[in-house]
């Protein structure tokens, strides 16, 4: 008996080139040395073919979005299954690809993660009441039986915030406020500090553009002395760890603009009264 298999367009796609996926694969391999990337490369091929001809509001090829989301996810250290799901997170909602197709080609885990993200995409929030916002955050967590769903959703929101300028002004305001009320606190709850900081700064730039520009300029004016101080501080901490025989990683960073804005507006401080413009993070294997 001859079995006729439906020939899907993404199965006719040639393998992805190294150039097309280099940034994503570099991020993934930097955290998973020697890991197999076949699943990620196949997911890219499917996403590229499925979104062929589609563009975003900005006019750029749609594939740029799932690629960016997957790169953010890879930067968080997630496994190949999660990165593959990130590449495919819009495929079911926006293309002919079905959940059954994903399960057949990528397995049950990818199907469940993509299904979870698709369901979250259908939720919309329109309140600024903190109690209701807290309830919505709890609902998002409850609906995400797998935390990887939330991580992809946060990465999706981060890239959408980075490209927010393509939307009409009223939508920019709504999305930015929703980001501040719902998604930034969720990122903080999951320990995704870098994502949380970026979400808050991007939301601030949209909600209070003049204040954002003023603070950004003041921070830039101080950047030479700040960078010198930060380098010295990191060096001192690294030296002290070495003296004590403690293995660890030390990372310094400028404080986010949102935290400076909070101190100036909420606590009524002037910029000159804010001295903690840098932060240092020390990561060790264990704490005694």
Regions found by a protein language model. Give the residues of each.
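Active-site helical microenvironments for divalent-metal-assisted chemistry
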Residues: 1-279, 284-288
């Amino acid at each position: 008996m001859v079995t006729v298999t439906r020939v899907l367009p993404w199965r006719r796609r040639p393998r992805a080139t190294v150039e097309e996926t280099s940034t994503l694969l570099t991020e993934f391999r930097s955290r998973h040395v020697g890991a197999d990337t076949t699943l990620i490369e196949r997911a890219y091929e499917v996403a590229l073919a499925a979104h062929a001809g589609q563009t975003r509001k900005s006019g750029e090829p749609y594939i740029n979005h799932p690629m960016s989301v997957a790169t953010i996810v890879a930067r968080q250290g997630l496994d190949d299954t999660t990165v593959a799901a990130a590449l495919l997170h819009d495929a079911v909602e926006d293309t002919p690809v079905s959940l059954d197709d994903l399960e057949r080609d990528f397995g049950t885990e990818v199907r469940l993660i993509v299904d979870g993200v698709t369901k979250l995409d259908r939720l919309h929030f329109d309140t600024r009441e903190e109690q209701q916002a807290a309830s919505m955050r709890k609902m998002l967590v409850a609906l995400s039986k797998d935390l990887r769903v939330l991580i992809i959703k946060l990465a999706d929101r981060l890239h959408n915030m980075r490209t927010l300028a393509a939307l009409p002004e009223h939508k920019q305001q709504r999305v930015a406020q929703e980001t501040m009320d719902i998604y930034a606190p969720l990122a903080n709850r999951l320990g995704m500090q870098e994502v949380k900081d970026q979400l808050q700064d991007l939301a601030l730039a949209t909600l209070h553009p003049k204040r954002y520009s003023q603070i950004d300029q003041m921070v830039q004016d101080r950047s030479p002395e700040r960078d010198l101080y930060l380098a010295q501080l990191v060096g001192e901490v690294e030296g002290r760890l070495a003296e004590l025989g403690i293995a660890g990683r030390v990372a310094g960073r400028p404080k986010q603009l949102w935290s400076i804005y909070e101190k100036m507006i909420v606590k009524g401080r002037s910029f000159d009264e804010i001295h903690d413009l840098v932060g240092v993070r020390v990561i060790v294997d264990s704490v005694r």
